[in-house]
């Protein structure tokens, strides 16, 4: 128990965006069962009893717990805080299973139906906002779940995800497309008193669960909220957006030396890409006027 707590407080708290969920999982499934035992008395069978109990219901979670505990013990060992090698030879397959890697991308028809469903308000207000912004920005769910109103700069038309909310621990800069501005300003006005863009922080598990079932309301084959992000990447690539720009928008760290040349933050290219994307979304949702409109003056 001490070893896991040490890792949680000395490492995970600063370096893992999912710290709160991790702490809860480890407490529920491991620490409360074997936490009172000294680490050197904790044999493989004791650990396995915890993982096996979880695997009966959710084998993927059991595998995740094993990987987390191995990481924690390795951290403690490197720091000479406590030494235990009992989990070294164990793999995910020994206690549970790896998550299925989804390759799901929504079709243009499905994405259009989802956008129309958002307009018809068939989801609750929190999820209408969350899903719409996931579609527009291709961001991670956590970046919106934790988003504070102070991150949104309407003078520069820029959303800055602070490194504390970013999985890669690097700040992410996203231009705010004109087309979504009225929706975001309405959210800000409505939720200003909370300081949070979405008005409250819902737990990751609740949001994931809602997202896993959302497709049913549209009679779609299964998709999850993360599949919206994959759809964003795929469709922007199909629109001919430079892969570097797509990587920047999704907040993936650039490989190797490319990070060094990254200080311009590609803002103009990102703005153009998101303007083109929101125009495409307007067409898919059936809200785009198929008439010649005066171009919106680009904000410098």
Residue ranges of predicted features:
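Active-site/catalytic core of tyrosine-dependent DNA strand-transfer enzymes
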Residues: 105-112, 156, 165, 175-221, ...
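C-terminal secondary-structure termini that scaffold catalytic or DNA-interacting sites
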Residues: 178-180, 185-192, 200-202, 256, ...
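Short, aromatic/basic-rich helix-turn unit that serves as a nucleic-acid recognition element
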Residues: 1-27
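Short, polar N-cap/turn motifs at the start of nucleic acid-interacting alpha helices
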Residues: 84, 151-158, 221-222, 241-262, ...
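A Lys/Arg-rich helix-loop hairpin that forms a DNA/phosphate-binding surface
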Residues: 1, 17-20, 31-51, 199-200, ...
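Catalytic-site neighborhood detector that most strongly recognizes the C-terminal catalytic loop/helix
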Residues: 97, 105, 161-169, 181, ...
